[in-house]
Amino acid sequence: MKILKLDKFDQIGIIVRDIERSSKYLGNLLDFKDKLQLVEQTNTVLYKGKEVTFKMKKIMQNFGGKQFEVIELIESNGDHLYSEFIKDGKEGIHHLGIYTKEADELIENFKNEYDIRVIQTGKYGKVKFVYLDTIDLLGFYIELISF
């Protein structure tokens, strides 16, 4: 079996406690081509096999050829990757996202070769996302994103 490796990332995901404060500094410190847009979004995901719904504020902006995603959790009816990150007292880089059409092959490869498992899955519109449990190995999660 050929061992698959990721050759790029497309998104950097950051969790913050106060997105309004963060967006002010991001807009002043980084040269975004467009004005930062703050939106609210509700998602339902499967986290460790349990369905959870949560609401968040987020910024999705292109920067330096990558998608820059900044997230503030507003409310939740259970635990998930974002709430656990915040409960652990963390703020900052949460995940690297990879756009792929080979999510199933990558998931199988990482499971077989490295015992890396899926920890959270979800869908938003036509976008499917799968988080791999790499936090203890890499210090952040890997998110596989397919359209």
Task: Report residues per predicted region.
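Function-critical acidic carboxylates
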Residues: L73
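Extended intrinsically disordered, low-complexity coil regions enriched in Ser, Thr, Gly, Ala
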Residues: E20-V39, I86-K90, T100-Y124
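Long, hydrophobic N-terminal alpha-helical segment
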Residues: M1-Y47
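Vicinal oxygen chelate
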Residues: M1-I3, F9-R17, I59-E69, S83-E102, I107-F147
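A cross-kingdom feature marking solvent-exposed beta-strand/loop segments within repeated
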Residues: L38-G49, T53, S76-D88, I93, ...
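Signature of short aromatic-glycine-proline-rich micro-motifs recurring in repeat-based ectodomains
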Residues: F54-K58
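Short loop/beta submotifs within extracellular cysteine-rich repeat domains
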Residues: D34, N77-D79, L137-F140
